[in-house]
């Protein structure tokens, strides 16, 4: 049975999916991001390559190719909600306590 099938990673939920880059060869157990341009994905990819050892360690990732190539516009960050919370009583400068 062929181990190194030309498959990389697939995101189980959401529209984003990582595929093999056209300019790179997919080795067994290696996950490659899709080629530019693409949206920022904060989903955890799940490896679909059947060969041992486990292909990729799932981790939150942000594709960085748009940072290196000015030909593509930077993806919008409108979908990422950032909320900060300040504990009450912390407006004054910090004071050491015993």
From Swiss-Prot:
Keyword NADP: no
GO CC terms, sorted: cytosol; keratin filament
PTM sites of type N-acetylalanine: 2
Stretches for region 4 X 5 AA repeats of C-C-X(3): 3-59
Keywords assigned: Acetylation, Keratin, Repeat
GO MF annotation: an example: structural molecule activity
UniProt keyword Repeat present: yes
Sequence repeat start-end pairs: 3-7, 8-12, 47-51, 55-59
Task performed by this protein: In the hair cortex, hair keratin intermediate filaments are embedded in an interfilamentous matrix, consisting of hair keratin-associated proteins (KRTAP), which are essential for the formation of a rigid and resistant hair shaft through their extensive disulfide bond cross-linking with abundant cysteine residues of hair keratins. The matrix proteins include the high-sulfur and high-glycine-tyrosine keratins.
Similarity-based family: Belongs to the KRTAP type 3 family.
Subunit description: Interacts with hair keratins.
Protein's name in the database: Keratin-associated protein 3-1
Species annotation: Mus musculus (Mouse)
Lineage: Eukaryota, Metazoa, Chordata, Craniata, Vertebrata
Gene encoding the protein: Krtap3-1
